């Protein structure tokens, strides 16, 4: 549905912090998105987390979910960062980690719009590997004009 070139239009992040490789489903009626991140042993964070037992840092799993939610928010607004709007990750609730994410995994990212109050957006997010949840959270983003 969205390749990396289009994703780069909707996210201001760049290597090594762009954590969405492809969007496979964007459902405006359900206000949801499904995307993925291919986790390679070549990711820079594996050099230090942890060299003998590499696992993806939890904060980056949360960030990947927030980036997927950000794409959904931009699409719902029909806006892009180039238009002068950004989403800032400002918090999470009900955060749970269930299992580690390892090199070679495909991290599936799901986000569903929950609410918007003024410029504060809430999304219900999940990250899965092989159909099993590895992380879930309610992600809060702030919409800001540049």
Swiss-Prot record:
Which is a Gene Ontology cellular component entry for this protein?
Answer: membrane
Give the domain of life.
Answer: Bacteria
Give the EC number(s) under which this enzyme is classified.
Answer: 4.2.1.59
Please name the InterPro entries in this protein's record. FabA_FabZ (IPR013114), FabZ (IPR010084), HotDog_dom_sf (IPR029069)
Which cystines does this chain contain? none
At the top of the EC hierarchy, this enzyme's class is lyase
Signal peptide stretch: none
Q: Which CDD domains match?
A: FabZ
**Any GO molecular function:** (3R)-hydroxyacyl-[acyl-carrier-protein] dehydratase activity
One GO biological process term is: lipid A biosynthetic process
Family annotation (SUPFAM superfamilies): Thioesterase/thiol ester dehydrase-isomerase (SSF54637)
Q: Where in the cell is it found?
A: Cytoplasm
Q: Which reaction does it catalyse?
A: a (3R)-hydroxyacyl-[ACP] = a (2E)-enoyl-[ACP] + H2O
Give the record's keywords alphabetically: Cytoplasm, Lipid A biosynthesis, Lipid biosynthesis, Lipid metabolism, Lyase
Q: Identify which residues the record assigns to the active site.
A: 49
* Record function comment: Involved in unsaturated fatty acids biosynthesis. Catalyzes the dehydration of short chain beta-hydroxyacyl-ACPs and long chain saturated and unsaturated beta-hydroxyacyl-ACPs.
Similarity annotation: Belongs to the thioester dehydratase family. FabZ subfamily.
Give the protein name, as stated in the record: 3-hydroxyacyl-[acyl-carrier-protein] dehydratase FabZ
Gene encoding this chain?
Answer: fabZ
